[in-house]
Amino acid sequence: MEIQTKTLGTQTVEAHQIITLERGLYGFEKYHRFALFDAVQVPFIHMQSLDDPALSFIAIDPFLFRPDYELDIDDVLLQPLDISSPTDVLVFALVTIPPDGSAVTANLQGPLIVNKKNRKAMQVAMGGDRWRTKHDIVAEMAERRAQEQC
Protein backbone atom coordinates (compact mmCIF):
# COMPACT_ATOMS: atom_id res chain seq x y z
CA MET A 1 0.00 0.00 0.00
CA GLU A 2 1.34 3.44 -0.86
CA ILE A 3 0.81 6.33 1.53
CA GLN A 4 1.56 10.03 1.29
CA THR A 5 3.64 11.75 3.94
CA LYS A 6 4.33 15.43 4.44
CA THR A 7 8.08 15.10 4.91
CA LEU A 8 9.06 11.84 3.19
CA GLY A 9 6.80 11.85 0.13
CA THR A 10 5.28 8.57 -1.01
CA GLN A 11 6.09 5.53 1.13
CA THR A 12 5.21 1.89 0.64
CA VAL A 13 3.96 0.12 3.76
CA GLU A 14 2.77 -3.41 4.42
CA ALA A 15 -0.27 -4.39 6.49
CA HIS A 16 1.94 -5.48 9.41
CA GLN A 17 3.26 -1.90 9.68
CA ILE A 18 -0.18 -0.42 10.35
CA ILE A 19 -1.46 0.05 13.89
CA THR A 20 -4.90 1.09 15.07
CA LEU A 21 -5.44 3.30 18.10
CA GLU A 22 -9.12 3.03 18.98
CA ARG A 23 -8.93 6.19 21.13
CA GLY A 24 -6.18 7.97 19.20
CA LEU A 25 -3.27 9.73 20.90
CA TYR A 26 -3.70 12.33 23.63
CA GLY A 27 -4.53 15.57 21.86
CA PHE A 28 -5.09 13.74 18.56
CA GLU A 29 -8.09 11.57 19.45
CA LYS A 30 -9.69 11.68 16.00
CA TYR A 31 -6.72 9.98 14.28
CA HIS A 32 -6.82 6.21 14.61
CA ARG A 33 -4.65 4.55 11.97
CA PHE A 34 -0.90 4.98 11.70
CA ALA A 35 1.86 3.35 9.71
CA LEU A 36 5.16 2.64 11.46
CA PHE A 37 8.37 2.57 9.46
CA ASP A 38 12.03 3.44 9.90
CA ALA A 39 12.74 7.14 10.08
CA VAL A 40 15.60 8.77 8.21
CA GLN A 41 17.69 8.73 11.41
CA VAL A 42 18.21 5.41 13.18
CA PRO A 43 16.99 4.39 15.81
CA PHE A 44 13.87 6.49 15.33
CA ILE A 45 10.53 5.26 13.97
CA HIS A 46 8.30 7.37 11.74
CA MET A 47 4.65 7.19 12.80
CA GLN A 48 2.51 8.45 9.91
CA SER A 49 -1.21 9.07 10.24
CA LEU A 50 -3.23 7.30 7.56
CA ASP A 51 -6.14 9.63 8.34
CA ASP A 52 -4.18 12.83 7.58
CA PRO A 53 -0.96 12.91 5.49
CA ALA A 54 0.10 16.12 7.26
CA LEU A 55 0.18 14.41 10.69
CA SER A 56 3.14 12.35 11.76
CA PHE A 57 5.22 11.66 14.83
CA ILE A 58 8.66 10.33 15.60
CA ALA A 59 8.94 7.51 18.13
CA ILE A 60 11.71 5.48 19.73
CA ASP A 61 12.07 2.26 21.69
CA PRO A 62 12.62 3.67 25.21
CA PHE A 63 14.68 0.67 26.28
CA LEU A 64 17.43 1.78 23.87
CA PHE A 65 18.34 4.70 26.10
CA ARG A 66 16.69 3.69 29.38
CA PRO A 67 17.18 -0.06 29.93
CA ASP A 68 15.75 0.47 33.43
CA TYR A 69 12.44 1.72 31.99
CA GLU A 70 9.48 0.06 33.68
CA LEU A 71 5.85 0.19 32.71
CA ASP A 72 3.56 0.66 35.67
CA ILE A 73 0.26 0.09 33.91
CA ASP A 74 -2.81 -1.65 35.33
CA ASP A 75 -3.63 -4.73 33.24
CA VAL A 76 -7.27 -3.61 33.12
CA LEU A 77 -6.24 -0.54 31.09
CA LEU A 78 -4.57 -2.78 28.51
CA GLN A 79 -7.52 -5.18 28.08
CA PRO A 80 -8.69 -3.50 24.84
CA LEU A 81 -5.39 -4.56 23.24
CA ASP A 82 -6.08 -8.29 23.85
CA ILE A 83 -2.51 -8.98 24.96
CA SER A 84 -1.98 -12.65 25.79
CA SER A 85 1.76 -12.55 26.53
CA PRO A 86 4.34 -9.89 27.42
CA THR A 87 6.30 -10.99 24.34
CA ASP A 88 3.41 -9.70 22.19
CA VAL A 89 4.08 -6.11 23.27
CA LEU A 90 6.04 -3.34 21.59
CA VAL A 91 6.63 -0.12 23.50
CA PHE A 92 7.40 3.25 21.95
CA ALA A 93 7.97 6.72 23.37
CA LEU A 94 6.89 9.72 21.32
CA VAL A 95 9.76 12.08 20.53
CA THR A 96 9.88 15.86 20.40
CA ILE A 97 12.46 17.47 18.12
CA PRO A 98 12.35 21.21 18.81
CA PRO A 99 12.99 23.49 15.81
CA ASP A 100 15.38 25.64 17.87
CA GLY A 101 17.96 22.87 18.22
CA SER A 102 17.39 22.30 21.92
CA ALA A 103 17.34 18.82 23.43
CA VAL A 104 15.53 16.01 21.61
CA THR A 105 13.24 14.48 24.21
CA ALA A 106 11.07 11.40 24.64
CA ASN A 107 7.81 11.10 26.56
CA LEU A 108 8.29 8.18 28.96
CA GLN A 109 5.22 9.09 31.00
CA GLY A 110 2.86 8.48 28.08
CA PRO A 111 4.15 5.42 26.23
CA LEU A 112 2.56 3.93 23.14
CA ILE A 113 1.77 0.25 23.73
CA VAL A 114 1.32 -1.98 20.65
CA ASN A 115 0.10 -5.57 20.48
CA LYS A 116 2.33 -6.80 17.67
CA LYS A 117 0.01 -9.73 16.89
CA ASN A 118 -3.23 -7.83 16.20
CA ARG A 119 -1.66 -4.35 15.69
CA LYS A 120 -3.99 -2.73 18.24
CA ALA A 121 -2.33 0.13 20.11
CA MET A 122 -2.99 2.71 22.76
CA GLN A 123 -1.22 5.53 24.51
CA VAL A 124 -1.21 5.19 28.28
CA ALA A 125 -0.59 7.89 30.88
CA MET A 126 1.47 6.58 33.77
CA GLY A 127 1.23 8.28 37.14
CA GLY A 128 4.04 8.93 39.56
CA ASP A 129 7.08 11.11 39.17
CA ARG A 130 9.75 8.62 38.08
CA TRP A 131 9.08 9.14 34.36
CA ARG A 132 8.62 12.52 32.72
CA THR A 133 7.22 13.76 29.43
CA LYS A 134 10.64 15.15 28.44
CA HIS A 135 13.62 12.82 28.82
CA ASP A 136 16.72 14.10 27.01
CA ILE A 137 17.54 11.17 24.70
CA VAL A 138 21.10 12.20 23.80
CA ALA A 139 22.10 12.97 27.40
CA GLU A 140 20.63 9.72 28.69
CA MET A 141 22.30 7.66 25.94
CA ALA A 142 25.65 9.31 26.78
CA GLU A 143 25.11 8.56 30.47
CA ARG A 144 24.32 4.94 29.65
CA ARG A 145 27.50 4.59 27.55
CA ALA A 146 29.58 6.10 30.35
CA GLN A 147 28.12 3.63 32.87
CA GLU A 148 28.82 0.70 30.53
CA GLN A 149 32.48 1.73 30.24
CA CYS A 150 32.98 1.71 34.02
UniProtKB/Swiss-Prot annotation:
GO terms for cellular component: cytoplasm. InterPro entries: Flagellar_assembly_factor_FliW (IPR003775), Flagellar_assmbl_FliW_dom_sf (IPR024046). GO terms for biological process: bacterial-type flagellum assembly; regulation of translation. Pfam families: FliW. Keywords: Bacterial flagellum biogenesis, Chaperone, Cytoplasm, Translation regulation. It is found in: Cytoplasm. Belongs to the FliW family. Acts as an anti-CsrA protein, binds CsrA and prevents it from repressing translation of its target genes, one of which is flagellin. Binds to flagellin and participates in the assembly of the flagellum. Binds to the C-terminal region of flagellin, which is implicated in polymerization, and participates in the assembly of the flagellum. PANTHER family: FLAGELLAR ASSEMBLY FACTOR FLIW (PTHR39190:SF1). NCBIfam families: PRK13285.2-3 (NF009800). Interacts with translational regulator CsrA. Interacts with flagellins FlaB1, FlaB2 and FlaB3. This is Flagellar assembly factor FliW. It comes from Treponema pallidum (strain Nichols).
